[in-house]
Amino acid sequence: MDPAAPAARMTSSFTINISTPSFYNPPKKFAPVVPPKPKVNPFRAAEEPVPQENSAGPGLRRAFVGKVGQIPSMAPPGGDPEDFVLPPPPPNEEPMSPPGSSFPPPPPSFGDDGPGSPLGLFPPPPPPEFSEPFPPPIEESFPSPPPLEEAAGLSDTQDPPASVPPPPPPLPSPPEPAPPVLCEAPKPAPVLPKPPPPSAFPKPEPPQSVAPKAQSSIFIPKPSPPSAVAPKPVAPPPVAAKPSGPGPFVGPSAAPPTHTPAPPAPAHTFSPKPVAGPTFAPKSASHTFMAKPSAPVFSPKAATEPPTEAPQERFPASQSSPKLTPAAKHEAPPPAAKHEAPPPASATRAPGFSFAQQRDKPRVLEKPRANVRDLVPEPPVETRGERTLGPQAEGGRSFGAQPIGGKDTKPLPEGLRNQTPDGTHRVGGQPGTHRPTPHQDQTSGSQGLNMKEVEELEMLTQQLMQEMDKPTPAAEAHTMELCGFCGRGLSRTETVVRAGEHLYHVTCFTCSKCEQQLQGQQYYESAGKPLCEECYQDTLECCAVCEKKITERLLRAIGQAYHPSCFTCAVCKCSLQGEPFIVDDNKLPHCVSDYHRRYAPRCTVCGDPIAPEPGRDETVRVVALEKNFHMMCYKCEDCGCPLSIEADDGGCFPLDGHVLCKKCHTVRARAALG
């Protein structure tokens, strides 16, 4: 092969590896599938005849499906049988490689659903809502498209599919089945034209002949170092041969396709599958199938097949053409592996299980509830936009779960959300009919309480309810109220009396004087003790004025109790509540003005009572010679000059009972002496 070729394409006889999903609990093996008779393709007449010349671009190498013992007539110059390396078939995948393709090589399908049939692009329908699979004639009438070589080269690295997709229908006039052309010893290499640049879409390539084969093998040309195709690991397990009926047939691919089907990549639309021990069983051609969770499904379609819009809507087109990382290029198998003959189909199928049986029961899919540790994704081998081959068991068929092809690259939360509590798993939003298995019963305990724990919880609840119904005496005494008088507990069944902030027995709540029961009667509290109305009246004080009981507001003054209305001035009878008052010698209250008018000393000069000045409570008076004077009336009797209250020259100089100033005093004294 030309080492400068950016990508290598190959086509081979269509081998369908029918295998059960990896989450089947018991391993199942099935008998060989009886190849059905070829059917007439209704779309054949409207398409162009199968061209016999290679329309692929230069540099693209391809292999063709031929008749028994017939070598392809067209072979590219420089074709060497040594360039074609037939990697061992995978233990759990059925590669599909129709010859022609109208789009660039898609990436290897990790976790592919199986044969590249037109149904491979459809998302899994909800089996619980449909009692029968979809009508097979609709999908079986489509001619098998030329699969991509990456699908065949990488299909062996994916886990067993979780569904049973139908094989593609045969073409109108298939020749007799025969072993594949390139399964023999080194023969003339099939025509492998060089591909155009990776960014361009290579032209479809016509097949040499349309020949369904009973037992065919998948072979991949040896990838060159720059090739983007990931070869298979060394010594993978054998792959069961496919019946000639459902084998892929090369449809007319001379003309470019009228549409560009994007290879579906439901890696981000389906939840990861549990890494449980897988078993392998033949796949059914039924229309009820479930897509693998984390790998694009490459379903071969004829180049002239009408476009199908439903698969493109269900599957994201962002991953339709992922690329292979260089890590996958270094795992090329030795050239000797290309001539290994696949074992018979009975090696991987249980006896007694035929292809027709799966068609009758297409939706009987068992999927155990995945353990949480099984759902933890392995270290991802897939990057955004690029895919690499994951580890795979070497040397013999491995029935244990292996993280291959980016199967478990889906995060755990989405996988857990797609798993319903009743054991039904949902893939891509569609429920799958899965019956619980013993493995599910074992793992269900980690998600909820088992029966023993539920019974224990119910028993504890019943015990708690009984304890609440029958409280202990200590708890009862602690929660009960106590009587305010006797201090004993108050039963919930007897009548109690609430007075203020305390509760009392009926017999205890009585008048503190006459011991009359006060239940239902008006009572008064005096010094913290209840009193009846009569006894309460006896404790009341009488007014000092009217001598009546003071039942309301009480005004206490001069050591006596008064009604506020009875405490008035003895002269003017004005209320003294809140006003200053003066009590006379008879203990009668007087207002200040009346008291001074009645009892205040009078001025010797003017004769008026000496009362406090307005706005003042104090009375200012001058006493001289045992006489009372107003401050303004304290003057010299002779000259009338004001006198000072101080003992100085301006003060009073009395003479013969007269209040005189110093000057007048001198005059009168001299006159008396003279």
UniProtKB/Swiss-Prot annotation:
What GO biological process, any one, is recorded here?
regulation of transcription by RNA polymerase II
Q: Which ranges are annotated Pro residues under compositional bias? A: 86-109, 121-148, 162-180, 187-209, 222-240, 254-266
Compartments reported by the entry: Cytoplasm; Cytoplasm, Cytoskeleton; Cell junction, Focal adhesion
Q: Where is the composition biased (Low complexity)?
A: 110-120
Bridged cysteine pairs (disulfide): none
Region Disordered: which residues?
35-447
Q: Which UniProt keywords apply?
A: Cell adhesion, Cell junction, Cytoplasm, Cytoskeleton, LIM domain, Metal-binding, Repeat, Transcription, Transcription regulation, Zinc
Q: Name the predominant localization.
A: cytoplasm
The entry lists its GO molecular-function terms as: DNA-binding transcription factor binding; metal ion binding
Basic and acidic residues: compositionally biased ranges = 328-341, 358-387
* Pfam families to which the protein is assigned, alphabetical: LIM
Domain LIM zinc-binding, first and last residues per copy: 481-542, 543-600, 601-671
User: Do you know which InterPro entries this protein is assigned to?
Assistant: Znf_LIM
User: Which PANTHER family does the entry mention?
Assistant: ZYXIN (PTHR24212:SF1), ZYXIN/TRIP6 (PTHR24212)
Query: What family is this protein classified in?
Result: Belongs to the zyxin/ajuba family.
Q: What function is annotated for this protein?
A: Adhesion plaque protein. May be a component of a signal transduction pathway that mediates adhesion-stimulated changes in gene expression. Suppresses the transcription-repressing activity of hesx1/anf1.
Q: Quaternary arrangement and interactors, per the entry?
A: Interacts (via LIM2 domain) with hesx1/anf1.
Q: What is this protein called?
A: Zyxin
The organism of origin for this protein? Xenopus tropicalis
Q: Kindly list the organism's lineage.
A: Eukaryota, Metazoa, Chordata, Craniata, Vertebrata
